Every structure is written in structure tokens, then in C-alpha cells.
Amino acid sequence: MKLTCMVIVAVLLLTACQLITAEDSRGTQKHRTLRSTARRSKSELTTRCRPSGSPCGVTSICCGRCSRGKCT
């Protein structure tokens, strides 16, 4: 009986701690879009681009622009 009461009290205490922590962290991430674009631009830097004169399309990335199927 004592063990059951101890388990119930422990579960209630942990639940209360999680709820308090969740309320405290609400609204701390102010610029969500900035983080996602920064992450995306970082991944774009690691991909290699095609030099000018190379063929381009949907799957290839040019260092400049893709014009009429060729990188410029």
C-alpha cells in the first residue's frame, strides 16, 4: 500500500514538473522562420553548383542562372 502511494505521488510530481516546464518554454522560439531558412541556406552551401555552359534543369543547380537549358 505504501509503495502504491509512493508511485502515485511520484507520477503526479513528474507530471506537474512537465506541465510547469512546458508553460515556461512557451513562446521562447521567436523567429522560427529564420532558423529554418538559415538551416536551408547552410545545406545549399554544401551542394555543388554547375558552372556556366553546363546543361541545367529541375534536378541540377547552376552557380548563376539557368537560361534555355544552360547555366549562365
From Swiss-Prot:
InterPro entries: Conotoxin, Conotoxin_omega-typ_CS. Disulfide bonds join 49-63, 56-66, 62-71. It holds the Pfam family Conotoxin. Keywords: Calcium channel impairing toxin, Disulfide bond, Hydroxylation, Ion channel impairing toxin, Knottin, Neurotoxin, Presynaptic neurotoxin, Secreted, Signal, Toxin, Voltage-gated calcium channel impairing toxin. Residues 1-22 form the signal peptide. One of its GO terms (cellular component) is host cell presynaptic membrane. Expressed by the venom duct. Residues 23-48 form a propeptide. Its main location: secreted. It is found in: Secreted. One of its GO terms (molecular function) is toxin activity. The modification 4-hydroxyproline is found at residue 55. Omega-conotoxins act at presynaptic membranes, they bind and block voltage-gated calcium channels (Cav). The presence of a 'disulfide through disulfide knot' structurally defines this protein as a knottin. The cysteine framework is VI/VII (C-C-CC-C-C). Belongs to the conotoxin O1 superfamily. This is Omega-conotoxin-like SVIA mutant 2. It comes from Conus striatus (Striated cone). The lineage of its organism: Eukaryota, Metazoa, Spiralia, Lophotrochozoa, Mollusca.
